[in-house]
Amino acid sequence: MTDWRTLSARASLASHRLIGWIYWDPTGIRLFTELGVPNGLGYYITTRSAPLANAGNDVVTAAFYTIREEFINLCLDVARQHTTFEEAYRVRNEAVVAGLQEYAPEIVNELGALASQLWAAADSLPIAGHTVYAAHKAWPRNEDNPVLSAWLAVNCIREWRGDTHFAILASEDISGVQAGLLHDAYLGYPGDWIPRSRGADDAQLEEAWNVLDARGFVTDGRINEAGLAYR
């Protein structure tokens, strides 16, 4: 019998390794800066939300769920002053190709050969309620560059997973800050690094801790076993 849970865990880790590095890639940040954006401000938020950003800041804030509204407003407003979201997407994609060729050249040909199958998988997913996925699915697929196209397909699938994740959090009445605290504990990160990195301030953190405590997930100021099991 197929162990779908194990396969899903493997796929999750593989997709994270294939996609996640681009969010902090020096080449991507440099190319984004060269578009005129001061110090590459907001590279992560702008390039990840580019297919959705023309719908407006509030739409991106709603879709991203765990990132503070003021962070998103700053990043997208600065980007609009200096470039377009299409250009931000283009240079991010340039960095993807450069990075794959530099860091993992051994996978380039085989990954590229999977592009059509990966897009078939992406297209097969249910679209309802999956906003970021839908936006990425609708943008150019760069079929003329197979490895980039394959990467974009995996990214699209990964955003579908993210949309699903946020829907589950919302259904459980877990805020973005609370989710960050639970995930910090699960990963063994110190303190409140994840919600802080997404813009949470002291007041928001205090509120989140209080809510988690009331749900029985906190002991002595730390997420307890019940909280970890819930997460």
Q: In which residue ranges do the predicted regions lie?
A:
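Phosphate/adenylate-binding glycine loop and adjacent helical scaffold
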Residues: M1-E206
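Accessory, usually C-terminal, subdomains that scaffold auxiliary metal cofactors
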Residues: R198-R231
